[in-house]
Amino acid sequence: MDGTLLASNLGFPEGPVVMPDGAIVFCDGNTGELRSWKDGALDTYAYTGGSPWGAVLGSDGAIYVTQGGPVPGSDESGVVSGIQRVDADGTVELLSSSIAGHTLIGPNDLAFGPDGRLWFTDSGSEQDFRFDVRVPGKLYVLDATGGGELLMERPEVYPNGIAFDEHERMYWTESAARRICRLDDGKGTVWAQLSDGHVPDGMAFAADGRAFVCTTVSGGVTVLSAGGEVLEEIHLGEHATNCIFAGSTLYVTATKVADIHVDQRTGTFWSVETDATGLPLIPGRL
């Protein structure tokens, strides 16, 4: 499986979503924007400010975003870490900046779960890939009333990407530990341990149970079996950050340099034609 470069000179792209009209909207953590790509044209979908990292499309047509706060090098003020909702007209609303008394520090990725709530990771750092910030990460859920709960606190492992498989089991990546974990009976278990140089970020499941995991440093996407074994590598030559399926096409956000700064423009956007069919995401709204 080979990748096709669709766009370049982006900031720090992350969190792609597939829109009903076929457009792909993704976050740009360096420019504070949601960007829209369709048929070769790249536009600004909305301005969130700060560092948007993850996104998921709600059944209400809104895009729900993890907001990491002001990007380094900017003069922004008033942008706080939290969960945002972006309506189709570009209106941005902060839904929550704390859960169950815990201030959100570095919300990273998110997905709707089978219970209708929004599940998300908080890496414990305001900015992506700050593994030197050794504070615990957390996993949270947010419900439609604005309430929520802390699912668990993780050690200094940088919880990152999150996804549900065909059995509606929740998985998340732990970048600093190079592993993917699964929630089993309320506890986190290690589902797959990756080798040196494979730092997992965002991920997407195929309908057959395979997991397509974006791995920075290694320069592409690592494909795992339903049992967690490495099957193959999709080499892009860049730090792959997140991905999403549209049918059998895997759309991947990436960056040549994993540097978060308002002036950095090394991000790229790719498509990969695969032999898989993407698993439909669980619908939800808040």
Map each language-model feature to its residues.
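Sequence-structural signature of mature extracellular/luminal beta-sheet repeat domains
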Residues: 1-286
